[in-house]
């Protein structure tokens, strides 16, 4: 499998195979290399700062709930959104004035806490997961974060069975963190649920860099590529691919 640098810097490739040719001022060349490394380091530091920027203090109820939910996710081997992705979800929910949100893939409640933070005070999160045990963790995390029980509706079951039962055009935002093999099939259902101007968001679309890797990839990565292409080509969507966490694909329904 080939490796990919998602943010390549301009300039020469350095390493054993890229020695300075004769006649080159090696002092200046090494200075340039040092500057490029500094730029790369500054970018990584900036991205790390941005990822942690909006994370609530661990001493608050929401911060403690997020930490607890992340620990449960790690123990269960469940993907959880990064703090930067959570910040983006909270912002998008708040910016759209969302009162009704669907989440596909409850997990242990990490992303749900961010979405509830961004929802209007009377807003409701409808969250779907095939594993009821995980939803029990999420329910406890929401309670720890201070959200009333009527703010979240947890529905167990496969997404493709549950989504058709939800109301057409009744939601402001649909967030997908479910089975990557079903991401494309769930797109149509997600758009049906959205009001005009509503948002659909998919997390994890970089797949750890594999989405843009030219080497052989598993089926789930191929499905993510199909999803990215389908969203970009639809005339009724306004898409953006945000470089937060493991990639957040968002699209507004025109």
Where are these predicted regions, by residue range?
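A short alpha-helical cap/connector motif
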Residues: 1-173, 180-201, 205-254
